[in-house]
């Protein structure tokens, strides 16, 4: 729920995983989620919106095909293809703090499901801002 790292717990236990294992009190998290300006409420609404976008895409069905695409160590990329082969989604995340331009020009015409203002035409370069994720779909 968008909680900052629990460094105090890590210092006590020495277990790296404890840094992100905060245990919420039910009343505390309920209060945070009701506050529309809280980090936890914003995080929860944004995750919900992403899941709603994902739910509507045939290429994200559990039985859809997945192909891993190697674009170097700074970009995580894979392609999902719907069972009926009508939809494909290229998911790319820039894992670095610098702009990345993956060598990925021949992908056809796509639009970004996460940002409706981004559209890519055949031959255009994809430019990823630091830590940006795109879900590029062909329909």
Where are these regions (language model features)?
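Loop/helix patches that line or flank the sugar-binding groove of alpha-linked glycan CAZymes
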Residues: 1-103, 107
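Intrinsically disordered, low-complexity, compositionally biased regions/tails
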Residues: 6, 18, 112, 126-127
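A residue-level signal for conserved active-site and pocket-lining positions in enzyme catalytic cores
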Residues: 50, 110, 131
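Intrinsic-disorder/low-complexity peptide segments enriched for small residues
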Residues: 93, 111-112, 126, 134
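Solvent-exposed beta-hairpin/edge-strand motifs
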Residues: 106-117
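C-terminal beta-strand-rich structural cap/linker in extracellular carbohydrate-active enzymes
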Residues: 121-139
